């Protein structure tokens, strides 16, 4: 979009070409917090928000943060193929629990998720709205899964980047609307889909406050932060 390109040009001409804060520009994190409030009517502290670069970078960081060699992760599939690779680089193993194709569209059976969890399961990746199936997780299912993962201390990595790609309603249900700040939940989102910024590689993640500093430290090992002028465009 023209407005976004213009903001990036202004930032470049203003000299925003140097390293930025690892967790992202203060102004952008505040704007993301405001955006989340505007669509979900919830308050997220800026300190819980990290802007590591692309949404895929955020997913990779979430996997690095929650998984190690002896662990297992569960992927709700069909899924984008990069997800299993993000898990594999941690040394963890993974398995998939599939959505089922029914006459009413794709569906996920939460009991199938429970049965697929192992003793060493540390993370569940779930993309809703889903690419490629278009399935959208219901609020009831979110409650069920969050309660289950809370009791087992399994981290939900919720990829909500398609939150505005939905028919009939303005925005898809988010785990953020029902979660406690301390819940084992990492929500990933970004600008690519909702704001037509696929090539800008700008996404964010919302984590429990208890791991936000560690997430920022881990981000330093990848790309330090998203380029400052791109953050200004966001």
Each language-model region and where it sits:
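A short helix->loop->beta-strand "cap" motif at the edges of active sites that frequently abuts
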Residues: 71, 92, 151-155, 181-183
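Conserved PLP-anchoring active-site segment centered on the Schiff-base-forming lysine
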Residues: 65-87
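Short acidic capping loops at alpha-helix termini that bridge into adjacent secondary structure
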Residues: 43-49, 69-72, 120, 182-185
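Hydrophobic residues in well-ordered beta-strands that form the structural core
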Residues: 75, 96, 125, 156-158, ...
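N-terminal small-domain helix-loop-helix segment of the aminotransferase-like
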Residues: 1-54, 61
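Conserved core segment of the aminotransferase class I/II
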Residues: 6, 178-234
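Active-site phosphate-binding strand-loop segment of PLP-dependent enzymes
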Residues: 99-168
């Amino acid at each position: 979009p023209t407005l976004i390109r213009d903001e990036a040009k202004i930032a470049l001409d203003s000299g925003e070409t140097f390293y930025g804060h690892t967790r992202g520009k203060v102004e952008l994190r505040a704007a993301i917090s405001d955006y989340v409030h505007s669509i979900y009517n919830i308050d997220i502290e800026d300190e819980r928000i990290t802007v590591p670069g692309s949404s895929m970078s955020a997913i990779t960081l979430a996997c690095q943060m929650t998984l190690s060699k002896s662990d297992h992760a569960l992927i709700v599939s069909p899924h984008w193929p990069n997800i299993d690779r993000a898990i594999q680089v941690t040394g963890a193993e993974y398995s998939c629990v599939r959505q089922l194709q029914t006459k009413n569209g794709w569906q996920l059976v939460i009991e199938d998720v429970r049965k697929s969890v192992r003793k060493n399961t540390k993370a569940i990746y779930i993309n809703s709205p889903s690419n490629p199936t278009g399935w959208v997780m219901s609020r009831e299912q979110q409650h069920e899964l969050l309660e289950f993962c809370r009791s087992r201390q399994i981290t939900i990595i919720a990829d909500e980047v398609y939150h505005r790609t939905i028919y009939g309603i303005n925005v898809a249900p988010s785990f953020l609307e029902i979660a406690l700040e301390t819940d084992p939940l990492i929500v990933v989102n970004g600008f690519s889909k909702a704001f037509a910024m696929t090539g800008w590689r700008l996404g964010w993640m919302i984590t429990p406050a208890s791991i936000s500093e560690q997430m920022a430290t881990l981000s330093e090992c990848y790309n330090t932060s998203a380029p400052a002028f791109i953050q200004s465009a966001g």
